[in-house]
């Protein structure tokens, strides 16, 4: 049910709960790529729940990119995909948190798919 009187933060939290519920229900054995965006940067890290550690990460800050726009999000996506493919990991689960799958998040995901990841 859509609630009209919710502010932006409450809607983001509801989206995040939905995404987490789907991840836990469907893909328990795959590593999870968690994407976080701020106003000026974007970052992605891959978490392996079986080993309980982060196995790869990439961000617009670590790559010395000026901002986190769509083009730079695509660069981050290809970078983390190449790191995972070197570790022979090609299937992951994508967690976009409470952010909409749109814009920078979608650009990062599409670039990771083009580089060879499956999710």
UniProtKB/Swiss-Prot annotation:
Protein name (record): Large ribosomal subunit protein uL18
Taxonomic superkingdom: Bacteria
Gene this protein is translated from: rplR
GO CC annotations on file: cytosolic large ribosomal subunit
Function: This is one of the proteins that bind and probably mediate the attachment of the 5S RNA into the large ribosomal subunit, where it forms part of the central protuberance.
Matches recorded under InterPro entries: Ribosomal_uL18_bac-type (IPR004389), Ribosomal_uL18_bac/euk (IPR005484)
Quaternary data: Part of the 50S ribosomal subunit; part of the 5S rRNA/L5/L18/L25 subcomplex. Contacts the 5S and 23S rRNAs.
Family that this chain belongs to: Belongs to the universal ribosomal protein uL18 family.
One GO molecular-function entry: structural constituent of ribosome
One Pfam family from the record: Ribosomal_L18p
Protein's UniProt keywords contain rRNA-binding: yes
Gene3D superfamilies: 3.30.420.100
Gene Ontology biological-process annotations: translation
UniProt cross-references to HAMAP family, sorted A to Z: Ribosomal_uL18_B
Keyword tags: Ribonucleoprotein, Ribosomal protein, RNA-binding, rRNA-binding
Coiled coil: none
Entry keyword Ribosomal protein: yes
């Amino acid at each position: 049910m859509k609630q009209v009187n919710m502010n932006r933060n409450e809607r983001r939290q509801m989206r995040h709960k939905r995404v987490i519920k789907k991840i836990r229900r469907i893909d328990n054995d795959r590593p999870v790529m968690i994407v976080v965006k701020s106003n000026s940067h974007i970052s992605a890290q891959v978490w392996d729940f079986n080993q309980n550690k982060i196995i790869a990460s990439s961000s617009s800050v670590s790559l010395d990119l000026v901002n986190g726009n769509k083009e730079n999000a695509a660069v981050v996506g290809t970078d983390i995909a190449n790191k995972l493919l070197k570790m022979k990991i090609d299937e992951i689960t994508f967690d976009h948190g409470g952010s909409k799958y749109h814009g920078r998040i979608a650009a990062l995901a599409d670039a990771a798919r083009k580089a060879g990841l499956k999710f």
